[in-house]
Each structure stands twice: as structure tokens, then as C-alpha cells.
Amino acid sequence: MARGGGKSGSLKDKLDGNELDLSLCGLSEVPVRELAALPKATVLDLSCNSLVSLPSDFCSLTHLVKLDLSKNRLQQLPVDFGRLVSLQHLDLLNNRLVTLPVSFAQLKLSLHHSPVEILSRLLGTPSSLLVFHSFHSWENQNLKWLDLKDNPLDPVLAKVAGDCLDEKQCKQAAVRVLQHMKVIQSEQDRERQRKLQAEREMEKKREAEQRAREAQERELRKREKAEEKERRRREYDAQRAAKQEMEKKTKKETVQTRKLASSSRPPQPARHKHSWSRSVLRALLLVLLCILCTLAVCKLTELQHQPLCVSVNTLYEDVVAAVQNHKTLQNMLQQNSQQ
């Protein structure tokens, strides 16, 4: 099979005014890049080729007004086929199409040829449900001619499309099919909105549940913290009470021990008095020793002529004389007492 993709120069050779005839060329692919370079070619005939599908970039050929894809092997149209908004005439005769993309509803149409009640009767849908797609919203829209004959269409779509045996039927087919696709698009939009709303509500519910859980967790932590604080306070009070009790017990035992110790030993004041007497006696002995040493120095050494020693010797002699007088007086008293 021949492949599309010849140079734009070779396509220009087939261009006749605004019509480009690529029928019966054995094409298995559409030369989209070369076609995009010929925006003047608003009428394109690709019939009687071996096309199985159309590339997604085919939808960029928005300058097309009339498109003939009849007698190929197309199994589906690109998802964005509705981007061909300038399209007024579309021939899809004798392909292998089962459904049409939802974007097909964007191909636009003019309702001057058929009222909404036609689709209402075909689909068994109350016309009030189709009022949303009003004449006002479509009055300047484009697609006017459509042929879907000899395709294994979905039964509902086949019933909507009907026959295309003459100009009038093909125009009515365009109206009916686009209305049908508009309804499907609206239903999908509503379903999408419903799912989106459900997801939002579910998200809000999850957020509310999360906030509730967080609030419960905060309350639980707060309660646990308060309980822990109360437990520690009780432990502190218990330890403090035990410490005070131990101090009281220790103090009591100390008092009792002191009482027992004081009752089992002699009184301390006499002991202190005896020690004081010894200290006084030692002091007196030390003074007496000093006096004797001084007398010895003043009597036996060359210092006896010094003024200090002279005074000491004089005092010594006076004391000795006084003692002797005292002994004489004492002897006299003893004698008198014996008589």
C-alpha cells in the first residue's frame, strides 16, 4: 500500500481551486503535515483509500469545510474530531464505524432544517429535556450534511442517523446525530459533574472525619496529660508525706536515744567543775614555779643587784618575815588553847 507523506509540491499538483482530490490513491495514512501547508484546500476528498484510522493531528486541519472519507476502513474517529469546527459536509459512507466521539457534538449545526421534536420522537425522550440545546444556541452553527450509511453503527445511533438517500435526509441526519451527541455530551457532563460533586462531598466528609479524629486525639492527649499530671502530683504528695513521717520518726528516736544516754551516765556539771578546778590548780602551780625561778635568779646570779631583783628580794624577805610572824602567832595561840 502507498503511504501518505509526499511533498506538498505533489499535492499542489492535485489542487484545483479550493478542492484537493486524493481519492483512489491507495493511502494508508493521511499526509497531515502536507495538508496543513495547504490551508486553501477547504474541500478534501480521501475516499476509496485504505485508511484504518486518522491521526490525532488530523484534527488540526480546522480550515476544512467539506470532507469525504467514504469507502475506507475507518474503525473510529479521533477523540478530538470536534475541533474541525468549520466542517459543513462530512461523508463517512461505507466504513467500519460503531460509535462517534463525544466531541462530535462540537461540529455545530443549524436547526433551521429540523425541530427538536424529531430527536425527541426518535429517542423517546421528552422534548423538555432537549430544550437546553435551544435554537438560539445553535442558530449560527455549521455542520449541515452527514452520511453514515453502511457502517456497523450502534443501534441507537443508527436509528438516530436514519438514511441518507437524498439531500434532505442527509441534512436531517446531520441535525439528528449532532443533537444526539449533544444529549450524550450533556449527560456525560452531568455525570462528570455529579461524580465531581460526589468526590467533593466525599472529600469534605473525609476532611470532617479527619478533623473529628484530630479533635478526639487532642482531647485524649489532653485528658491523658491531665491524668499524668494528677498521678505525678499524688506521687509527690505521697513522697512528701512519707518524708515528713520519716523525719518525725527519726526525731522521736533521736530524742529517746538522748534520754536513754543521759540517764545511763553521771551528771555532767560535776565533771565540768572538777576539770575547772584542775585548770586553776595548774595555773597556780605555774605561777608559783615562775616566782621560785625568779627568786632563784635574783638570789643566786649576778642579777641580784639589779633594781628588779632588789625589789623581788626585798619582797621575798618581807614575805618570809610575815610567815615567821604568822607561825609565832600560831604557836602562841596553840599554847593558849592547850592551857
From Swiss-Prot:
Keywords: Coiled coil, Endoplasmic reticulum, Leucine-rich repeat, Membrane, Microsome, Nucleus, Repeat, Signal-anchor, Transmembrane, Transmembrane helix. Residues 187-256 have a biased composition (Basic and acidic residues). SUPFAM superfamilies: L domain-like (SSF52058). Interacts with SGO1. It is a single-pass type II membrane protein. LRR repeats lie at residues 10-31, 40-61, 63-84, 86-107. It is found in: Microsome membrane; Endoplasmic reticulum membrane; Nucleus envelope. The gene is LRRC59. Residues 181-254 form a coiled coil. Its main location: membrane. InterPro entries: Leu-rich_rpt (IPR001611), Leu-rich_rpt_typical-subtyp (IPR003591), LRR_dom_sf (IPR032675), LRR_domain-containing (IPR050216). This is Leucine-rich repeat-containing protein 59. Residues 186-275 are annotated as: Disordered.
